[in-house]
Swiss-Prot record:
GO terms for biological process: ATP synthesis coupled electron transport. This is NADH-ubiquinone oxidoreductase chain 4L. InterPro entries: NADH_UbQ_OxRdtase_chain4L/K (IPR001133), NUOK/Mnh_C1-like (IPR039428). It comes from Nephelomys albigularis (Tomes's rice rat). The gene is MT-ND4L. It is a multi-pass membrane protein. The keyword ATP-binding does not apply.
Length: 98
């Protein structure tokens, strides 16, 4: 396994740990999710370039679309929650009350 893949897996694991450890603020959770998506995108793109199959070129583009949708929805929720509650603390939110 090349050092690039090891570094990308470490970046994914550190982003996952950041998501688990720093889940008190919504903004830090969104940043960790973006780090996970970026490391997955780079891994999939580099593996698609190594296999040189036409079907594998579609997967990174699909991941970019899902990543952009995830970022847009996350930022919209962050703005809505910060305007409604005045903070981005996840503990203060009760999603069952809407």
């Amino acid at each position: 396994m090349s050092p690039i893949y090891i570094n990308l897996m470490m970046a994914f694991i550190f982003s996952l740990l950041g998501t688990l450890l720093f889940r008190s603020h919504l903004m830090s959770t969104l940043l960790c999710l973006e780090g996970m998506m970026l490391s997955l995108f780079i891994m999939v793109t580099s593996s698609a370039l190594n296999t040189q199959s036409m079907i594998t070129y579609v997967i990174p583009i699909t991941m970019l679309v899902f990543g952009a949708c995830e970022a847009a929805i996350g930022l919209a929720l962050l703005v809505m929650i910060s305007n409604t509650y005045g903070t981005d603390y996840v503990q203060n939110l009760n999603l069952l009350q809407c």
